[in-house]
Structure formats: C-alpha cells, structure tokens
Amino acid sequence: MEEPIIIDNNNIESLSQQQHSTVTNIDSNAGNVLYIDKDMWWKLLYTMFITTGIGYLMAKRNSTSKFRIIKPIPVVILGYIVLLWCSIHHKSGTQQMFNLIIPNNPTTYAMYISVGLFLSAVGDFFLLYKRFFIHGVFFFLVAHISFIFAFTSSEQFFTPTVTALLVGIVCLFVYMYLAKVFPLFSKMGISKSLAIALLFYTSVIVTMCFTASVKSFLKLITIINNNHDIFSNIFSSFSFYASIGAIGAVLFFISDLMILVREINQLANGQVSTIRKLLGHGDLGMIVYWLGQFCIALSVTEF
C-alpha cells in the first residue's frame, strides 16, 4: 500500500525558495554568457580590423592586385563597431545578443562618425584606381564634413568665442596657404585650379581638427569641474577618451599631408631627402591613416 503524500506548507515554501535560487543562478549564468560573447565579439572585430589591414599591406608589397581590394575593409569594420557600441550600451542585457549582430539605436554622434567612416571606405576603394582619384578625394572630403558634424553635434558647441576662433584660424590658414604654398605649387607646374581645390580640401581638414580639439577641450573642462582633483582627472581614462577624437583627427590630417608629400616626391624625380622619403612612404601613411580612423571611432566610447 502506497504511503499518503503529506503536503506541508514549510516544504512548499522551501521548494519555492530553491526554485527561485535556481532561476536566479540560471539568469546570472546567462548574463555571464552574454558578457563573454560580447567580449569575444569585440575581440573578433578588432582582430579582423588588424588582420585585413596587414593583409592589404602585404598584398600591396607583393603587388597582388586581386587582394588589394581589401583596402576599404578595415574602415568598414570600424564603422560597424561604432554602431554596435551604441546598440549594446543603450539596451538591456536580454537584448544584447541581438544587438551584437544588428546595430540599432545609435546616437547622433555615432551616426555622423559611422557615416564618415563608411564614406572614407568608399574613398579608399576609388583611390585604388588612378582614374578615379578625384572620386576618392571627393568621398574623403564629404567624410571630413561628416566628422565635423559629429564633433559639433552638441548644442552648446558654437559659442561666440569658439566661432570667432574657428573663423580666425581658417582665415590665417588660407592666408598662409596663398602666401607660402601657392607660389611653391606654381613653381612646380601645378595648375591653379588644382591648387585652389587643395586649398578648399585642406581648409576642411583644418576645420575638422579644430572642432575635434575644441570638443575634447570642453569635455576635459567638464571632467575637471566635476572633480577638484585636477591631476588625477587629467590622466584618467575619461580624459583619454575625451581626447582621443582630436588625436584621431590630427593623425588623419597627417596621413593626408603624407600623401601630398609622396606626390611632390614623385614630381622631384627621386631627388628628395631621407625624411621626405619616410614621410612619403605609402605603408607608413596607411598605418597613420588607420590609427587616426581607429581613434576617431574610439571616441564614441566617451558617451
């Protein structure tokens, strides 16, 4: 004869607590799995960025034209990472797995940065072919403008002081260009139309560097004001991320200048100094360019 089942309220309460503990542990473990997957996904993306960059440099060195097509891929990956960053850090844990694949809910800053990166990638593609050089430069010009929109996206950016400084710096740059660089181009046989186009292009780059620097400076001031310990804040990770966008913009500018140096070196028929050869080295220019784009992409983590 089977023994009767005795229902005890204490046993039910104990069982309920055990089930709740089990569910909690499962949720906790699931959260850990999500975190590990996210971490692995970032590592995979950064590995792809570095690997494709090295692959392009090797293909270029070995004159493998078929594989040089991977040149735009590193910057495309950076644009994708920027959008994913916003997706993951603005959603709850239960949605993170989906957001690891499909970007959504990006900030205004991230949108402008990612658009600039994707436009740069298109420019990289066109620059693979000499007959599309102008097309590539155009896409890079629009990419710079997109970065300017990102750096100035804050409503408090354009104060009278900042606006006056921006106008003054651009005017000074134009004057120096016309007084020093323009005559040099004339001696080298460069047409006036090309020299004027370069003036417009470099003016946009100078504006990008200035707006990125002002944005970083204002962010640093905010960080310092929130904590009176100035020295610890200056060397904190927050200050680093606040400054990284300006560093990236300057590196981007330097990479463009290195392209200009390389073109001038070619016109000089090899009669150039060792420093100019180094500055005009294509591989070094690409590394500086990728570092600049990486820093600009990394600036999205400030938000």
From Swiss-Prot:
Lipid bilayer topology: Multi-pass membrane protein
Database matches in Pfam families: YhhN
Organism: Dictyostelium discoideum (Social amoeba)
Protein family according to the UniProt entry: Belongs to the TMEM86 family.
Gene: tmem86
Glycosylation sites: N62
Signal peptide positions (record): none
Keyword field: Glycoprotein, Membrane, Transmembrane, Transmembrane helix
Keyword Transmembrane helix found: yes
Cellular localisation: Membrane
Protein name as annotated: Lysoplasmalogenase homolog
GO cellular component: membrane
Induction: Down-regulated by Pseudomonas aeruginosa, PAO1 strain, infection and by phagocytic stimuli but not by Pseudomonas aeruginosa, PA14 strain.
Transmembrane region(s): 39-59, 69-89, 109-129, 132-152, 165-185, 194-214, 234-254, 278-298
Database matches in InterPro entries: TMEM86B-like
GO molecular function terms attached to this record: hydrolase activity
